[in-house]
Amino acid sequence: YQIDTTNLTTLAEVADYYNRQGNRSKMLDFEERLFKDSRAPVKDKEYRLQQYTNNMEFYRENYFRLGSIIVGLTIDYPTNRTFINAYAMHLIGGGATEEAYDYMLRHIDDASATADDYIMLLQYMMFLEKSDEEIQAMLDRATERFEGNDTLLSFKGFYYTEVEEYGKALKIFKQGVKRAKKLKDNKLRSQYLGYMGDIYHEMGKEQMCFRAYYDALLYDENNIPVLNNYAYYLSLTGRGLDKALTMAHLAMSLDKSNATYIDTCAWVLYKM
């Protein structure tokens, strides 16, 4: 019998049939028709593409055919972030690292760009070892565009911590504390105070580190990273070991699967 190639449901069913049979070449013949058909919902195209690109073995075996599909999708839907990011990752997978960077850069000011898209670009810039000036300029663009986005604000603070510009990192996290206070979000406030404690430790300012951790636990007594770090750094001083053990036990009980928290608890017991 003849297949009705004008029926989207039929095309999808036939593609899925060949997939189950292991005939990937025939499956892609029908997938290509689906992806090119303007009647097919964009969400369905996003879902089907992600299925194939997430399967790395399949992706490697069909790199060029999937690449052709992705290129077609970026032409048909030039502002769709799923397809934009898929093409960028496709270029990276093919070794075209600078071309991928230029492509991501061209699309970062699109109206459809999200805070996560900026973070992806920033991480890629760090991977490519772009200059500090370029990265910092992009960080500023991101936080200006998405003012009040805590993920971006934290990322910016972590970046300055990583490059040991602790003063700038502290300033950013203090902004976060003020923002959390205004929002009356105690968990967020605790989170930023914990980050500040980590920086003070890196700076060798022990008392300010402990004060920040203490304040963080006032706003969220179950802040696991703070409980763990406070316990560990306090134990290094040889003081307050009972308090350190209590915090280490609590951190471990709140996340039993994390080996770091188990190690901290064992370390504090050893110090006692």
Q: What positions do the PLM features span?
A:
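Alpha-solenoid helical repeat scaffolds
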Residues: 1-272
